[in-house]
A protein has these predicted regions:
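Basic, helix-initiating cap at the start of DNA-binding domains
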Residues: 1-41, 47, 58
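C-terminal peripheral helix-coil segments that are non-catalytic and often amphipathic
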Residues: 1-2, 85, 92, 135-139, ...
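Short amphipathic alpha-helical segment with a characteristic S/N-K-E followed by hydrophobic residues
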Residues: 17, 32, 55-60, 70-71, ...
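Short loop-to-helix capping motifs
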Residues: 28, 97, 107-112
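Hydrophobic alpha-helical connector segments
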Residues: 70-100
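Amphipathic alpha-helical packing segments from all-alpha helical-bundle domains
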Residues: 96, 103, 113-139, 150, ...
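Hydrophobic alpha-helical segments that form the core
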Residues: 127, 131, 144-166, 174-185
Length: 197
């Protein structure tokens, strides 16, 4: 939040404004987020919005950047099972936070604030999860070379973005297993049987 000198900003109003912004992004999309709509829904003045965020992109960054859209799974005992737990989210429809983030994907290509919000919500948490999963594999004596781990992260991220831009909805358990066994595991262990990973 930016804010200007003067009266302190109300944290409660800030939260209310961000919640309204998330609702608009999730239900109507980035193109419908504007100060008039936010102010009307929040029953607040537009000045209160612009004291906090100079642009709607800055507001969207604050709203979405607070999310953690990827969670590092608990240790499942194997690389395959850790990855399966990470990808389990793909089996459910997009929730409110994911729909809000998804609404920014196309526009983020041309807007630094939107990109930063998505980086904070998805890109960095996913990279941390992949790093943790790779470290666990190494601790089990199944080290994944750094280059292959980076490739794994890039491919999973691409699938995540596809999930956000597709109208297809959730994947089935079988589809997730097929992606895992036929695409992801061969990236990290091309010479090993998947069952041993």
């Amino acid at each position: 939040m930016s804010g200007t000198p003067g009266r302190p900003l109300s944290a409660e109003l800030s939260e209310q404004l961000l919640s309204v912004a998330v609702d608009i992004l999730a239900d109507e999309g980035w193109g419908k987020l504007n100060s008039d709509r936010v102010a009307a829904r929040a029953r607040a003045g537009k000045a209160g919005i612009y004291r906090r965020w100079p642009t709607m992109a800055a507001m969207a960054r604050s709203a979405v950047g607070r999310f953690t859209l990827v969670r590092t799974p608990a240790d499942q005992g194997s690389l395959r099972d850790d990855l399966a737990a990470l990808l389990d989210r793909w089996r459910r429809p997009l929730d409110r936070e994911e729909r809000a983030a998804a609404s920014l994907v196309g526009a983020a290509r041309h807007d630094e604030d939107l990109r930063a919000g998505l980086d904070a919500a998805l890109v960095r948490p996913l990279a941390e999860a992949i790093g943790t999963i790779g470290a666990r594999a190494a601790d089990r004596g199944q080290e994944v070379p750094t280059v292959r781990l980076a490739l794994l992260g890039s491919v999973i991220e691409a699938f995540w973005w596809q999930r956000y831009t597709s109208d297809r909805g959730a994947m089935s358990r079988e589809e997730v297993s097929r992606v895992l066994d036929e695409v992801l595991l061969p990236l990290v262990a091309p010479d090993r049987e998947n069952a041993s990973v």
